[in-house]
Swiss-Prot record:
Belongs to the orthopoxvirus OPG077 family. Each virion contains approximately 670 molecules of OPG077. DNA-binding protein which binds to the hairpin form of the viral telomeric sequence. Required for the production of mature virions (MV). GO terms for cellular component: virion component. It comes from Monkeypox virus (strain Zaire-96-I-16) (MPX). This is Telomere-binding protein OPG077.
Length: 312
């Protein structure tokens, strides 16, 4: 009986010790979760249908090479896939055919001829989307209701006035209080989406003149996506541990490498740049310019002078 009582006491002590142990562990876990500030999950959004690029707006030699002439429209994902699978080596580097047939700037060609293919600066599959996007060109005009409208960045006011004159869009006098509001039909929205790759922002087929002006400004703006960028100062390469190549008086690095290096300096939970990074770039980026990664990239680089080759 005494032995049984001793066993009960032993079990009782073990239970209390075990309870205290687990309680302490649970408290530690809760504290860690509270201080960690777990990032919120993004709300899942319905996937938008992919826009088809009209065949006449895709580089003609590319269309012929892959037999796309009879397509009603070419998905950009198909262009991406064809570029990735036909113009790169097994090691993921741009091959000689790609250098000849894809759209490269003169600077890009000079850099590729200067560096070794094994260099991290060499164009690789991470640049597929940029190269694929260059195979499509912006429309210079669109047709609607028997009228042809020309797209010129410095003549957008004339374009809107012509749309009104032709009654392709109509002034909504009731809604026009602070700004002129126009009724834009679904048929015209479809034409713009197909030819210009994006739709204007409308609500119940109503759009303001300001929004319409901004829309045409964006779609007529030249795409200046770059694979290589010029650093404002050689010290930037040291701060961010970037590979570089010097061409004349300019020091180049890959845009993707610079973006990734800056992104790695963003705190995962606070979404702000690390304080040490602020100190390192203070000379090049003003405090009010540290808005996001894209803005910092702009501040650390010199605008490229783009001269394209292989365009049609």
């Amino acid at each position: 009986m005494a032995e049984f009582e001793d066993q009960l006491v032993f079990n009782s002590i073990s239970a209390r010790a075990l309870k205290a142990y687990f309680t302490a562990k649970i408290n530690e876990m809760v504290d860690e979760l509270v201080t960690r500030k777990c990032p919120q999950k993004k709300k899942s959004q319905a996937k938008k249908p992919e826009v088809r690029i009209p065949v006449d707006l895709v580089k003609s030699s590319f269309v012929k090479k892959f037999g796309l002439c009879n397509y009603g429209g070419i998905l950009i994902s198909l262009i991406n896939s064809l570029v990735e699978n036909n113009f790169f080596t097994k090691n993921g580097k741009l091959d000689d055919t790609g250098k000849k047939e894809l759209v490269l700037t003169d600077v890009e060609k000079r850099i590729l001829n200067t560096i070794d293919k094994s260099s991290p600066l060499y164009i690789d599959i991470s640049d597929v989307k940029v190269l694929a996007a260059r195979l499509k060109r912006s429309a210079t005009q669109f047709n609607f209701n028997g009228h042809t409208y020309h797209l010129e960045n410095d003549k957008i006011e004339d374009l809107i006035n012509q749309l009104v004159k032709d009654e392709s869009i109509q002034l909504d006098e009731k809604s026009s209080i602070k700004d002129s509001m126009y009724v834009i039909p679904d048929e015209l929205i479809d034409v713009l989406k197909t030819r210009l790759f994006r739709s204007p922002q409308v609500k119940d087929n109503i759009i303001s003149r300001t929004r319409l002006y901004d829309y045409f400004t964006r779609v007529t703006k030249r795409d200046e996506s770059s694979i290589y960028v010029i650093l404002k100062d050689p010290r930037i390469a040291s701060i961010l541990s970037l590979e570089t190549v010097k061409m004349g008086a300019f020091m180049y690095t890959k845009h993707s490498m610079l973006t990734n290096a800056i992104s790695s300096r963003v705190d995962r939970y606070s979404k702000k740049f690390q304080e040490s990074f602020y100190e390192d770039i203070a000379e090049f980026v003003k405090e009010n310019e540290r808005v996001n990664v894209s803005r910092v990239v702009e501040c650390l680089t010199v605008p490229n002078i783009t001269i394209s080759s292989n365009t049609e």
